[in-house]
Amino acid sequence: LPFVQPSSSAALDDTLYARVLTWSDAQLLDQQAVTFLIPGNDQAHPVDTQVYEVAQTPSAAPHILQFSIVFRGPLAPQMSQRTYRMRHAECGDWAVFITPIAQSVGHIDYEACFSYRA
């Protein structure tokens, strides 16, 4: 799907869910800054992260492509496991489900896993 225009809202809509983040997209995002928007009462609260690792994973099913992205973010605010609006300044917005996977001195790592028919 084409570029999804950034919104000032953290709201997730059908257009955002329909946009597939592909392996090619993930490779372009490697080591790039991305922002997750946390829904708030009045406005979205941005959490700036860095794409720390992009890795393709083997699939037992034919024609299925699998990969993961690890995002490195600040200690606070901590994002819980859920789907967020993720924004890249040049590539636009996606709906991405992330899970916190590790906490170290000064940062928290989050992972998103993807799988789609290639």
Ranges and model annotations:
Residues 27-29, 77-80:
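Short solvent-exposed loop/turn micro-motifs enriched in small/polar/acidic residues
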Residues 51-53, 98:
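Conserved hydrophobic positions within beta-strands
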Residues 2-37:
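C-terminal segment of N-terminal export signals and the immediately downstream linker at the start
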Residues 32-41, 82-89:
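Short conserved beta-strand and strand-loop elements enriched in small hydrophobics
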Residues 83-118:
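Short, compact, well-ordered microdomains
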Residues 57-69, 105-115:
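Short, solvent-exposed secondary-structure boundary/capping segments
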